[in-house]
A protein has these predicted regions:
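Residue-level marker for the onset of beta-strands and adjacent loop->beta junctions
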Residues: 9, 53, 153-155
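C-terminal beta-signal and adjacent terminal beta-strands/loops
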Residues: 52, 125, 143, 160-184
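Short, glycine/acidic-rich beta->alpha junctions
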Residues: 146-153
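Conserved small-residue
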Residues: 11-17, 21, 30-145, 178
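Membrane-embedded beta-strands that build the outer-membrane beta-barrel scaffold
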Residues: 1, 19-29, 40-48, 153-159, ...
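Small-side-chain secondary-structure face that scaffolds active or pore-lining regions
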Residues: 2-18, 39, 169-184
Length: 184
């Protein structure tokens, strides 16, 4: 049906599979300290999972949609070779005017200058571009990271002694790639 005022909502039509593990280890004990019982406890947890699309109707293989084999949280981007060191170095490098927003917005300097990021020409066509943004033609785009948190862990410490109770809990994530957004 026609939708007025907004785009139609996305369909929940993908099949996916999540695989992972959880590990929890705990130790508690007590002993006498100055003729009084001292109880202590230590606990550690570690968990990880990966979610992958197993079925989705994306016949063109558009990389900005779900596709079979996609891991949730994928970050597609350009590979960085370094920085342009001089204002003329761009002459010996693949054209990147399509992907450099500073060049697109600046009417005075229409080429990369010293300090601009130098992207790698992965498809060898002397132009940095997104191709068709499909799996079969991603241009110079590649998977450069994943925003899904990996290896969540926690540590729980505590003791009881002579009417005094102490407990501390720490948690964190050991790996996560961060993407500031397309406008940064």
């Amino acid at each position: 049906p026609s939708v007025f005022g907004t785009s139609e909502p996305q369909e929940n039509a993908a099949n996916l599979r999540t695989r992972g593990f959880e590990l929890s280890v705990k130790w508690q004990d007590k002993f006498l300290l100055a003729h009084r019982p001292f109880e202590y406890r230590v606990g550690f947890t570690l968990a990880d999972n990966i979610t992958e699309i197993t079925k989705f109707d994306n016949p063109d293989g558009q990389i900005d949609q779900f596709y079979k084999g996609k891991r949730l949280g994928e970050i597609w981007g350009y590979t960085v070779e370094g920085f342009f060191q001089t204002d003329t170095e761009y002459l010996d490098h693949a054209d990147q005017t399509k992907v450099n927003r500073r060049i697109q917005r600046n009417y005075l300097i229409n080429h990369p200058v010293a300090g601009d990021i130098k992207f790698k020409d992965l498809d060898g066509n002397e132009e940095i571009s997104p191709g068709d943004k499909t799996l079969s033609n991603p241009g110079d785009l590649r998977i450069i990271g994943n925003t899904s948190p990996r290896y969540s862990c926690s540590l729980n410490l505590g003791f009881n002694y002579s009417g005094f109770d102490f407990s501390a809990f720490f948690q964190g994530i050991m790996k996560r790639d961060w993407w500031p957004g397309k406008d940064n």
